[in-house]
Amino acid sequence: MSYSQAVEAVTAPGARFELTTVEVAGRPTRAFRNAPSSLRELFDAARRHGDSTFMVYEGERWTFADTMAEVDALAAVLVEDYGIRRGDRVGIAMRNLPEWVVSFAAITSIGAVSVSFNAWWVTDEVDFAIGDATPSLMIVDPERAERAADPCERRGIPLIVARGGSDPLPAGARHWTELVERGTPMPEVDVHGEDDATILYTSGTTGTPKGAVSTHRAICQALLGFSCRGAIEVAREKADGEPAGAAGSTGPDGPAGESGPRVFILIVPLFHVTGCIPVMLGSFAAGLKLVMMYRWDARRALELIEAEKVTQFVGVPTQAWDLLECPDFDSFDTSSLRNVGGGGAPAPPKLVRRVQDGFAHGGPNIGYGMTETNAYGPQNSGRDYLTHPTSTGRGTPIMSVEIRDPDGNPVPVGALGEIWMAGPHLIRGYWNRPDETAETIVDGWLHTGDLGRLDEDGFLYITDRAKDMVLRGGENVYCAEVEAAIYEHPAVYEAAVYGLPHERLGEEVAATVRVREGEHLDADGLREYLGNHLASFKIPSRLHMTTSELPRNASGKMLKRELRDSDLMEDQDLTPSQR
C-alpha cells in the first residue's frame, strides 16, 4: 500500500482520523474531527483506565485512578483556596515529579494556563519569567521554592510546595500535603478549544526566553496527529501482510505488536515540549505506563528499561549514545525496546548504525518538531526510515510543509530553503511578543528558521539551523554535515561546529571536540582524517580538543554560544602570530 493510499484509508469518513475544516485565527484549516475539544476532555477520558498503572517514579506506582483523584483535589484547591479562574496563569517549577503531571492536568482542566518554568533556571531567570507571565500562583518543589521565593514575595504571589517535607517554607508558601485531599470533586468549568492552555518557554540558547502560547485545540490536534502517523504506517504493514509494528511504526497508542503494552520512559524534562506533549500527554491519552526519571542517568535508565519493560525511548541523540556507551550496557536486558529516537535533525549516521546494532529490536526513528509546533512535525520510522535514512520523514494529513526562499516564495522540489509549516497544531503566538509573533507566524504559516529541502515524494531533509550555518568566504558550510564527519572518527565522543569571525573570510569554521577517554587525538590528526571526507573549506581551521563534557541545556541541546564565546575570549588573549 502506498503512503497516499494509507492516508486516505485512515482519514476516511467515519474513521478515527476523519478530517474536517475548522477556523483557526480566522482561516479555514484542515483538522481531525475526532480530536478532544480540550485537555479537560482528554483527562476525563483517562479515568476509564482506572487501576492501570500510569506513573512509575522511584518506587512509587500511581494508577490512573490515583492520578485523577489527586488532579481533582488540586483543581478544587486552585479554584476554592486561591481563586484561580479560566485564563489565569499558574506556574510550575519543578523537576520531573508526579506532582508536575498532576499540576498540569489540574491547571488546564479548570481553564487556567500552565506556565512551565525551566528547572535549571537560577533566581534571575525565574524572576524574569515570573515578571513576563505574571502567574497568580506558583507550584514548586523545594529547590525551586528557594529560587522563586524572593521574586514571588516581591509580587505577592503565593506558592504551593510539593515534597517539601518538614523544611521551613518561604513566606506565602504552603505544603502540597496540607492542601490536597483526595475525594474532592473536580470543579465544573467550561473549557473551550480556543482557550489558551500552556505557555512553554523556548530553551533560550540565545537571547531572552520567549513564552510560546498554545491553545487546547492545538495540543489535542498534535496529540491525535502523533497517533495518526503511527496508524498510517500500521495500515501499510497490514496491507502488505506484515504484523503490526514489524517495521517499527510509532504512535503513542499504536498497536502493541508482539512486544506487549507500550511503555514510555520519560528521559527529557516535562518543562520542554517533547517531555510534556508526545511523551507525558501521549501516555495519558492512550492509557500507557510512564516511567519517570528525576534526572538523566544512563545506568539508571538501563535499570528501568529492564525492570519496567520499556518499549519507547524518546529523547535527544546524545541520550541514546550515552546508553550505548554505558560500561554496564551489556549486563542489562534492553530487548523490550521497540523504538529509540527523538526530535530534530537526523542523528549522525554513526549513531544510527549503533542504535541498529546495539538494540535487538529497537529500530531508530526521528521526528521533526519544536515548541512552536507542539513537537508535532514530519516523522520517519519503519520502512520509510530504511528507504530514506537521511530524511526526517513526511507530513501527515493536517500538516502542510513548504520550502521557501528568503522572500517567502516557494522553491522548486529539491531546492534548499527555509522550512515553513502550517496546521491547527501551531502555537497561537509568543506571550507579550506581538512583533516576534508577527515575524514568525505569517498568514497561518510558521517559518521555522531551519534549512531543508523536500523531495518529489514529500520527504523532508533537514540541512541545518539557518543561524547554524557558517558563511566562509562566500561558501555555505552546514554545521550538521561537518559534525557528522567528525563523529565518524573512532576517537571522538562528541563535537560541536560553529562559526567565528574572520577578518578576511567573514567567518571561519571552528569546532570543539571531546575525545573519548583513553584515546589520543590532536587537531592535526583530526584535520588529516577529515581531509578524506570533506572539502577543504569545510574542515575547521580552529579546533579545540578536550576531554571534558561539552555544555548542554536542560533539553540536551549543545550550547554552541558558550563554546563560541569561549573561543573568542581565548582569541583576544593571543598575539597575531599565535592565531
Features from the language model and the residues they span:
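Structural core segment of the AMP-binding/adenylate-forming
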Residues: 1-15, 109-178, 517-519
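ANL superfamily adenylate-forming
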Residues: 20, 59, 146-193, 208, ...
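Conserved AMP-binding/adenylate-forming core of the ANL superfamily
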Residues: 34-35, 51-85, 89-97, 101-105, ...
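Conserved AMP-binding A3 loop
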Residues: 63-65, 197-225
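AMP-binding/adenylate-forming catalytic core of the ANL superfamily
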Residues: 121-128, 138-142, 313, 423, ...
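Conserved AMP-binding/adenylation subdomain of ANL enzymes
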Residues: 222-263, 271-311, 326
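Gly/Ser/Thr-rich phosphate-binding loop
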Residues: 285, 307-315, 324-387, 400, ...
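AMP-binding/adenylate-forming catalytic domain of the ANL superfamily
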Residues: 535-555, 576-579
